[in-house]
Amino acid sequence: MGGSGVARKPGILIIVENLTVPLDRRVWQEACALRDAGYTVSVVCPKGGRYQDKYELLDGIHVFRHPLPFEARSAAGYLLEYSSALAFEFALSVKAYFKVGFDAVQACNPPDLLFLSGGFWKYLFGKPFVLDHHDINPELYEAKFGRRGFFHRVLGILERLTFRVADASLA
C-alpha cells in the first residue's frame, strides 16, 4: 500500500456489541487466532469494566471502544441501545479503516442490525462480510418477554437480512 513498497498484512475488522474485549472470551479467542494466523486484527466493541480506553493496542490487536449509554430493559430500550451502538460502531469502523485498514468484516450478533455496517463495507468497498452468529434473537426475545408479536417478527426479518447480506456465517 502507498509508496513505501511494503506490503500490508491482510486485515480483519471484528464488530461486537454485547461485551468489550478481552472480556468477551469467544471474540477475543477468535481475534487472537486471526492475529496468530498472520492477520492484522481490529475490534470495535463497547467499553466495559476496567476497559475504558477509546483505543488501545492490546496484545497486537487494535481495539476501538465506544460508550454504551445505557443497558436496555424493554423492547423500546433495546431499539435505542442498538441504534446508538450501531452509530458508534459504524463511526469506529471508518476510523479503523483509515487508521489500520482491513480487507474483511466479521460482525458478531446480537444485534441483527450489523448487516447495515457489513453491507456498507461489502457493497461500497468490496469487503467480504462474515456473520459470527452468537444468538438466535427472535427466540431470545420470546424467551425474555414471553410473547411473540411485532418485535418478534421484526427480529426475524432482521435475522434473515443479516444472513442474506453475509458472504459466510460462523456459529
Where are these regions (language model features)?
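Active-site loop/turn elements of alpha/beta-hydrolase fold enzymes
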Residues: 46-48, 68, 133-134
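N-terminal subdomain of nucleotide-sugar transferases
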Residues: 1-63
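Membrane-proximal helix-turn-helix segments that form the acceptor-binding/catalytic region
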Residues: 94, 113-116, 120-125, 131, ...
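Structural motif
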Residues: 11, 103-104, 168
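A short, charged, and often flexible helix/loop element on the N-terminal side
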Residues: 62-91, 147-151
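Feature marks short, surface-exposed loop/turn motifs that line or immediately flank catalytic pockets
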Residues: 70-72, 137-140
